[in-house]
């Protein structure tokens, strides 16, 4: 007998096998996309910090007292390279910024860089730049104002802030 079609059993077996493959492959693919979006978000946060570091190094008019804070707004630092967040929506420029904290004294001081970056679906609450990791990216960021974020992180009632 010359068969030119599949039997119902063969079709059901094939569909079952494809269904099992989909159950395994789809969640892995989705988690891979999420991981890539978080990595891109972290990359943007680090780039924002790098722009603030360059601004501190290159602009001698920027000065802050020891124990004081310089805040660079997202809008100030954006050189046009931040077209959109990893979800293809604009960053929340009103709630995204870099805080530079000058610690030490006249003979020995250091700048610590903190970043808060808020996107459309995820965000990074004010975090020390050295500790930025994908695990810091949250789905529902706090969207704190500059003053509240500094008060929360540094436990200071009324911080001295210089805005740029």
Where are the language model's segments positioned?
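Aliphatic-rich helix starts adjacent to a transmembrane/signal segment
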Residues: 19, 28-49
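N-terminal alpha-helical signal peptides/signal-anchor transmembrane segments
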Residues: 44-63
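Extracellular/periplasmic head regions of type IV pilus-like filament subunits
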Residues: 60-123
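N-terminal single-pass transmembrane signal-anchor helix
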Residues: 2-29
